[in-house]
């Protein structure tokens, strides 16, 4: 575990080479009492514009894990539970080899069922912002689908829309039409993913609204199990995967400030960085404010901060 000033940059557990994403280090754990499982460790790395930034955000990995675990639990309840991959976030209940220091893993680690990830980001938008706003202003469409005239920046859409993107292992995810997605994975599977994604978004947005947060948009990932069933995987409704706005300022005719990494994107845009060369270090005040935004999102959505975080 590589830690810099209490922030975790990367992990090197004796579990074989990890699969490193932009934020997470993943290890396969086959053959334990939980079956074919994966260990997902959320580091404090942050990415923007398809680059991993050189600066860490302390406690970010704990926030992502706490929020995802909250949603997985919430969506498991009721008469229509959402199947998902999370087994536990309790490191003492994980079948790890003797000698592994579990301390640095606490609060930032999920043990999950292994699934074949379907290679599309399932994006759901309820409000107009980001690349959707730019496309709408240019053509009146989002991902090629026409929208009513007269929508404003940061405005609510008539209904949530599904706008998939190709999922890249590294590099740039590309927005595609629903028709392209259906052609690649089949009409039936595409329809299931669209319906389930909009349903989970709507349920999450309703909970967030009761906590004073608007979920402007988010992205989900789904995985296929050996029996053909589809389950919710990766992270869910976090500040990395979503735009969270204060409800009090949403719908004012401009895109509000947010509880997510848009603050970092905005700073990078204003810094003069060309997005084709390695990104600059984030200043200390940007790091501190970003951390505060993530903690605020966690506190508002879940009612508490991650264990051990003040």
Predicted segments with their positions:
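A short mid-domain helix/strand-loop element embedded in enzyme catalytic domains
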Residues: 155-187
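A long amphipathic alpha-helix within ATP-dependent nucleotide-binding catalytic cores
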Residues: 185-216
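Short, active-site-adjacent segments that bind or coordinate small-molecule cofactors and metal centers
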Residues: 113-115, 210-218, 223-225, 291
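A short small-residue
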Residues: 48-51, 174-185, 272-278
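Active-site loop/lid in soluble adenylation, ligation, and acyl-transfer enzymes
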Residues: 2-165, 275-281, 285-310
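C-terminal helix-cap and adjacent tail motif
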Residues: 236-297
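Conserved metal-phosphate-binding beta-hairpin within the catalytic cores
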Residues: 124, 215-236
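Coil-to-beta-strand transition motifs
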Residues: 35-37, 117-119, 212-215, 227-230
């Amino acid at each position: 575990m590589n830690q810099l000033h209490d922030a975790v940059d990367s992990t090197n557990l004796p579990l074989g080479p990890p699969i490193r994403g932009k934020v997470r280090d993943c290890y396969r754990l086959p053959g334990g009492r939980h079956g074919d499982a994966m260990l997902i460790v959320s580091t404090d790395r942050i990415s923007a514009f398809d680059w991993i930034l050189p600066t860490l955000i302390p406690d970010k990995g704990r926030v992502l894990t706490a929020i995802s675990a909250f949603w997985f639990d919430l969506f498991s309840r009721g008469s229509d539970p959402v199947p998902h991959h999370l087994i536990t976030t309790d490191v003492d209940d994980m079948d790890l080899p003797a000698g592994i220091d579990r301390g640095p893993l606490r609060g930032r680690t999920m043990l999950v069922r292994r699934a074949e990830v379907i290679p599309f980001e399932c994006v759901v938008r309820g409000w107009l912002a980001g690349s959707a706003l730019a496309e709408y202003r240019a053509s009146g469409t989002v991902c090629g689908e026409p929208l009513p005239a007269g929508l404003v920046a940061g405005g609510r859409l008539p209904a949530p829309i599904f706008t998939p993107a190709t999922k890249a292992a590294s590099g740039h995810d590309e927005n595609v039409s629903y028709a392209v997605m259906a052609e690649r994975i089949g009409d039936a599977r595409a329809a299931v993913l669209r319906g389930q994604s909009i349903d989970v978004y709507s349920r999450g947005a309703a909970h967030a609204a009761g906590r004073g947060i608007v979920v402007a948009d988010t992205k989900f990932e789904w995985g296929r199990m050996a029996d053909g069933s589809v389950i919710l995987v990766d992270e869910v409704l976090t500040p990395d995967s979503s735009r969270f706005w204060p409800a009090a300022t949403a719908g004012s005719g401009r895109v509000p400030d947010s509880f997510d990494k848009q603050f970092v994107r905005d700073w990078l845009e204003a810094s003069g960085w060309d997005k084709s060369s390695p990104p600059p270090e984030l200043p200390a005040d940007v790091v501190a404010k970003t951390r505060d935004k993530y903690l605020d999102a966690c506190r508002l959505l879940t009612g508490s901060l991650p264990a051990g975080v003040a």
